[in-house]
Amino acid sequence: MVALYDYYKNSISKKLMLNFNYSSVMQVPKIDKITLNIGVGIATIDKKNLDFAISDLTKISGQKPLITKARKSIASFKIRKGYPIGCKVTLRGNRKWDFFERLIFIVIPRIRDFRGFSNKSFDGKGNYSIGIKEQIIFPEIDFDKIDRIRGINITITTTALSDREGYALLSAFNFPFRT
């Protein structure tokens, strides 16, 4: 099992249960899934860019990404409905905990000029979204073998009912929020 999950089960869930006065352990918020997304707008011009993005996301997540397609045609962006414009991965179970542990302890400390994440990126229901500007901060990506710098959107979906509960959950994991 993953050490971070054991820490959640044995320590964090008990703290949250006391702080929010939950009557059942099932009410305690938990991390439901983590979604990684790379948008490749240049894929309309050159399809190889999408292949490189898929390769990067496969290395980072450990599973094959789903290709996202345009929902409608937009002439100014030169895309048509059904064009592949990105890729995404949804992590659950042990892969979710492995990725979250790597994110907190390895990836985030490698971000240049990092001062903490904003606590305003919650969506109102306890889910948190992060935008990372460079995929090269992940140790799985070899700097010499990339074709270009790409950003990655990371969404941490929780079972929390409010932003306050989601913030308390992520703070308990020592997630680096700006103070």
Curated annotation (Swiss-Prot):
The answer, when asked if Ubl conjugation is one of the entry's keywords, is no
Instruction: Give the record's GO biological process terms.
Output: translation
PANTHER family per UniProt: 60S RIBOSOMAL PROTEIN L11-RELATED
Task: Identify this protein by name.
Answer: Large ribosomal subunit protein uL5
Q: What does this protein do?
A: This is one of the proteins that bind and probably mediate the attachment of the 5S RNA into the large ribosomal subunit, where it forms part of the central protuberance. In the 70S ribosome it contacts protein S13 of the 30S subunit (bridge B1b), connecting the 2 subunits; this bridge is implicated in subunit movement. Contacts the P site tRNA; the 5S rRNA and some of its associated proteins might help stabilize positioning of ribosome-bound tRNAs.
NCBIfam families, alphabetized? PRK00010.1
- Asked if Ribosomal protein is a keyword of the record, the answer is yes
Q: Which InterPro entries does the annotation name? A: Ribosomal_uL5, Ribosomal_uL5_bac-type, Ribosomal_uL5_C, Ribosomal_uL5_CS, Ribosomal_uL5_dom_sf, Ribosomal_uL5_N
